[in-house]
């Protein structure tokens, strides 16, 4: 007898049902990525515009003066005050109409070929309410060199806890 009891038969049927459902589950709920080359088909930027934290930390250490990127934090002011990438500036929370208007007003004074790096880090990157509106606005304004710093989990986890340089306050 293949299944000696109702309990074993029930367990085997449950395992069979689970194994049949796994392929469907992977389509409906794909696994979270590590953030490497984090580009979804709905993201407005290309893979070439994606910056990983480790790479950007090295770039920060190697560039000074005019070759250094203009770093723009597009998240919430309180988080910026608590800690941010050195040299970053804050010009409004991009998920709000007022914040996006402040960002656009400030950035309109820069040459369109400015080397820009935008980032947030308020929450998991896939759910960030700030990064996509900021990127889209800059792109629509004609900025041609915009890169996105991908912080998969948050600024605290993916930057601070890794020991990358940080600055506090405004």
Predicted feature locations:
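Second-shell loop/turn segments in exported
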Residues: 41-47, 92-93, 121-125
């Amino acid at each position: 007898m293949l299944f000696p009891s109702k309990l074993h038969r029930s367990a085997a049927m449950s395992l069979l049902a689970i194994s049949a459902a796994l392929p469907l589950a992977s389509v409906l709920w794909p696994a979270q990525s590590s953030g490497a080359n984090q580009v979804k088909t709905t993201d407005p930027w290309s893979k070439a515009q994606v910056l990983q934290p480790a790479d950007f930390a090295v770039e920060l250490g190697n560039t000074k003066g005019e070759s250094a990127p203009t770093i723009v934090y597009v998240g919430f002011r309180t988080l910026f005050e608590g800690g941010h990438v050195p040299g970053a500036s804050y010009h409004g929370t991009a998920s709000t109409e007022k914040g996006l208007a402040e960002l656009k007003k400030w950035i309109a004074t820069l040459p369109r070929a400015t080397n820009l790096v935008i980032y947030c880090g308020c929450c998991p990157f896939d759910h960030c309410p700030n990064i996509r509106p900021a990127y889209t606005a800059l792109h629509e304004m004609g900025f041609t060199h915009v890169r996105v710093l991908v912080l998969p989990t948050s600024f605290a986890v993916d930057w601070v806890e890794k020991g990358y340089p940080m600055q506090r306050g405004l």
